[in-house]
């Protein structure tokens, strides 16, 4: 039986699984899946093209099962003690393991085991949850959080206090995805499986969930659930039909191509909007 089949079958009977009742086969399958997520060999979601992703539901199910097969235990990072089911990613790492991994993790940075952090990533005091994938060259700035199973692309900058939503609590169908070369401004929140397509710039304090209307002021088009590639987005509002009030929305103020994005600073893109 394949790893996927074992996980799928076990998930159907998850209510009966506890640390004392789990079978050796299921436990090893779950732990092996977590190991593969941790190493980057397996991802919860795989990119097929711009804005197109395939979700490996069974990998997400393995993450959920991992909470059922383990008891809470005391965890120690050398400074503080914690009581949880999931150890941190590099709790037992040696200097050589850090060098081989090729990323920086400054004091205060936390990544849970089962998350993947690629080479040349910088983790400031931030949090990367289980199942997440942070690709090469990304910056996870201070107090930013990368939620469970979220996918962060190459050269993405998550500014201070940014929240990228997870999919486990509450359970969501698809992970939140930030594609390559995106900039997410300070204190912004992208949640509920929204996809920010490559090369987009999200200004400070923009909140986008599945129900958020994303208004393109150039074309008049309204998007939900995704930010089109190369968008520059700020927070705004849309009037109600009767004009009695306005509701929050995100506004695409301009589109930029990769060449313009490479030559232009983020501040310049957001000026004169």
From Swiss-Prot:
GO MF term list: 2,3,4,5-tetrahydropyridine-2,6-dicarboxylate N-succinyltransferase activity; nucleotidyltransferase activity
GO biological-process terms attached to the record: diaminopimelate biosynthetic process; lysine biosynthetic process; lysine biosynthetic process via diaminopimelate
GO cellular component entries: cytoplasm
Record carries keyword Transferase: yes
Top EC group: transferase
Pfam family, one: THDPS_N_2
Keywords linked to the UniProt accession: Acyltransferase, Amino-acid biosynthesis, Cytoplasm, Diaminopimelate biosynthesis, Lysine biosynthesis, Repeat, Transferase
Main localization category: cytoplasm
Catalytic activity, EC: 2.3.1.117
Residue numbers binding substrate: 104, 141
InterPro entries: DapD_Trfase_Hexpep_rpt_fam, Hexapep, Hexapep_transf_CS, THP_succinylTrfase_dom1, THP_succinylTrfase_N_sf, Trimer_LpxA-like_sf
CDD domains: LbH_THP_succinylT (cd03350)
Pathway(s): Amino-acid biosynthesis; L-lysine biosynthesis via DAP pathway; LL-2,6-diaminopimelate from (S)-tetrahydrodipicolinate (succinylase route): step 1/3
Subcellular location per the Swiss-Prot or TrEMBL entry: Cytoplasm
Swiss-Prot/TrEMBL catalytic activity: (S)-2,3,4,5-tetrahydrodipicolinate + succinyl-CoA + H2O = (S)-2-succinylamino-6-oxoheptanedioate + CoA
UniProt record similarity statement: Belongs to the transferase hexapeptide repeat family.
Protein name as annotated: 2,3,4,5-tetrahydropyridine-2,6-dicarboxylate N-succinyltransferase
């Amino acid at each position: 039986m394949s790893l996927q089949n074992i996980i799928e079958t076990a998930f159907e009977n998850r209510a009966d699984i506890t640390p004392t009742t789990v079978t050796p086969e299921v436990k090893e399958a779950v732990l092996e899946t977590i190991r593969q997520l941790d190493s980057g060999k397996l991802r919860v979601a795989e990119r097929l093209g711009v804005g197109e992703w395939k979700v490996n539901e069974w990998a997400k199910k393995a993450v959920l099962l991992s909470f059922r097969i383990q008891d809470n235990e005391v965890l120690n990072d050398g400074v503080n003690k914690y009581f949880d089911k999931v150890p941190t990613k590099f709790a037992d790492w040696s200097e050589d393991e850090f060098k081989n991994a090729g990323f920086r993790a400054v004091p205060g940075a936390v990544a849970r085991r089962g998350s993947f952090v690629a080479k040349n990533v910088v983790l400031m005091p931030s949090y990367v949850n289980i199942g997440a994938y942070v690709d090469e060259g990304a910056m996870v700035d201070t107090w930013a959080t990368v939620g469970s199973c979220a996918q962060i692309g190459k050269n993405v900058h998550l500014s201070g206090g940014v929240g990228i939503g997870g999919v486990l609590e509450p359970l969501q169908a698809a992970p939140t995805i930030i594609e390559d070369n995106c900039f997410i401004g300070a204190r912004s929140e992208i949640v509920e499986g929204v996809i920010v397509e490559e090369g987009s710039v999200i200004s400070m304090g923009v909140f986008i969930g599945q129900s958020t209307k994303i208004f393109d002021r150039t074309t008049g088009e309204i998007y939900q659930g995704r930010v089109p590639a190369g968008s520059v987005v700020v927070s705004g509002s849309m009037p109600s039909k009767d004009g009695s009030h306005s509701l929050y929305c995100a506004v695409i103020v301009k589109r930029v191509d990769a060449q313009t994005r490479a030559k232009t600073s983020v501040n310049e893109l957001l000026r004169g909007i």
